């Protein structure tokens, strides 16, 4: 038998003697194979000179009979079915290693197996994990992301006052619901000044501007100022007053508000003094009787201030925002045209405009909308008017509010830049 490794040609012997020797050698080789067969569970263990991963062989010119070829084919299928799965790292490690040639058979007869390294590599079956590799899909490539509007949670603004008995947390919602019901009784007709014979809108503005200065000089609380203005408007909407009595109406309204809100009430003589003795003590007392009877002693009506406190709390405003909102709402007190807005709307607009002024952008969250019961669109008309008042607050003759809030006591808040963008947006729209 001639075997050429270079040409890979197998020459079959023809002599009868050689055939007999071949038969004996084949039987001996088969016995050797049976002795060397191992159990399946250790079939992958390395043998001396053997490959870890079973290689693919190409038989050329074999002398095996058809029956032996079928048996080997069955064994190969069984072997493939029992072979453990091959991982990606194992395949890469094995392909990177240099293939070693098989150990030649001990006898010169039997199966002559020749291994072509290049063909073996090409014929190597791909493991199941690599035949159909799973590529994780990128959701950004397959699905177009849609803008999802996440609702902003509503903050419980009363949770910090749960242990404060004076805050009346259990009843605060009912209280402000009642204020909303009653605020319509505190509103006056927007054209009531037309019924006055000797008065006009400018005279009212002069009176309110002067009372704001008096209120600041006496160091009275904010509730007193808002109640004073409310009493004046309600009285003038029901009673004709001469021009020379208008200042007296303002002094009496301030006196009644102090009696209702303040702990320490100014004496009548002090009020006469600040009027430059234009009125006497009896004039003050007589006007007090007239005003109470005209209003039917109905003093306690909600003004802008209780709403302002509640809405500032809902906005979680800092001190600067509180002062700016107070400045804006006091500017509105002077203007007669602002009477057409209900107290709650005016308070909410003051908070909204103050936030926009400080932040430089429109700001109104779901918590503010929930507690104020006004959307941002409902506030825009009133807000633009407040910005206009802020822009011209330092000019003209009525600058009492501007001078009050231009002091260090109020952090010079009146000098801050107005929210011009709110007015410009209305012009563009």
UniProtKB/Swiss-Prot annotation:
It comes from the Eukaryota. SMART domains: CYCLIN, Cyclin_C. GO terms for molecular function: cyclin-dependent protein serine/threonine kinase regulator activity. Expressed in roots, stems, leaves, flowers and siliques. Signal peptide: none annotated. InterPro entries: Cyclin, Cyclin-like_dom, Cyclin-like_sf, Cyclin_A/B-like, Cyclin_C-dom, Cyclin_N, Cyclins_cyclin-box. It holds the Pfam family Cyclin_N. GO terms for biological process: cell division; mitotic cell cycle phase transition. Keywords: Cell cycle, Cell division, Cyclin. Interacts with CDC20-1 and CDC20-2. Belongs to the cyclin family. Cyclin AB subfamily. PANTHER family: CYCLINS (PTHR10177). This is Cyclin-B2-1. It comes from Arabidopsis thaliana (Mouse-ear cress). The lineage of its organism: Eukaryota, Viridiplantae, Streptophyta, Embryophyta, Tracheophyta.
């Amino acid at each position: 038998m001639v075997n050429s490794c270079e040409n890979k040609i197998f020459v079959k012997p023809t002599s009868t003697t050689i055939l007999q020797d071949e038969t004996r050698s084949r039987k001996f080789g088969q016995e050797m194979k049976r002795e060397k067969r191992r159990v399946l569970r250790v079939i992958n263990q390395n043998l001396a000179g053997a490959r870890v991963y079973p290689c693919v062989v190409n038989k050329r010119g074999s002398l095996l009979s058809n029956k032996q070829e079928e048996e080997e084919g069955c064994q190969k299928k069984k072997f493939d079915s029992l072979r453990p799965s091959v991982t990606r790292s194992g395949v890469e490690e094995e392909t990177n290693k240099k293939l070693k040639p098989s150990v030649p058979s001990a006898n010169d007869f039997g199966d002559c197996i020749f291994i072509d390294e290049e063909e073996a590599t090409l014929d190597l079956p791909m493991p199941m994990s690599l035949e159909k590799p799973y590529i994780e899909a990128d959701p950004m490539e397959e699905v177009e992301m849609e803008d999802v509007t996440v609702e902003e949670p509503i903050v419980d603004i009363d949770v910090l006052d749960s242990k404060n008995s004076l805050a009346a947390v259990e009843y605060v919602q009912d209280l402000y619901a009642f204020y909303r019901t009653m605020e319509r009784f505190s509103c006056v007709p927007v054209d009531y000044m037309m019924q006055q014979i000797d008065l006009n809108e400018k005279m009212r503005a002069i009176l309110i501007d002067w009372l704001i200065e008096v209120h600041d000089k006496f160091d009275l609380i904010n509730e007193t100022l808002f109640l004073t203005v409310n009493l004046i408007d309600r009285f003038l909407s029901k009673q004709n007053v001469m021009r020379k009595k208008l200042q007296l109406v303002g002094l009496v309204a301030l006196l009644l508000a102090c009696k209702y809100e303040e702990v320490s009430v100014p004496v009548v003589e002090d009020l006469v003094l600040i009027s430059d003795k234009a009125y006497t003590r009896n004039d003050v007392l007589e006007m007090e009787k007239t005003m109470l009877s005209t209003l039917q002693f109905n003093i306690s009506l909600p003004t802008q201030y209780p709403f302002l406190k509640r809405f500032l709390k809902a906005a979680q405003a800092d001190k600067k925002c509180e002062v700016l909102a107070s400045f804006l709402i006091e500017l509105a007190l002077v203007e007669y045209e602002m009477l057409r807005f209900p107290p709650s709307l005016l308070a909410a607009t003051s908070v909204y405009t103050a936030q926009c002024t400080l932040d430089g952008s429109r700001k109104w969250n779901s918590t503010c909308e929930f507690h104020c019961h006004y959307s941002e669109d409902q506030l825009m008309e009133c807000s633009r008017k407040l910005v206009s008042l802020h822009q011209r607050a330092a000019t003209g003759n009525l600058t009492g509010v501007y001078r009050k809030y231009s002091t260090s006591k109020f952090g010079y808040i009146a000098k801050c830049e107005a929210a011009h963008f709110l007015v410009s947006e209305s012009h563009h729209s």
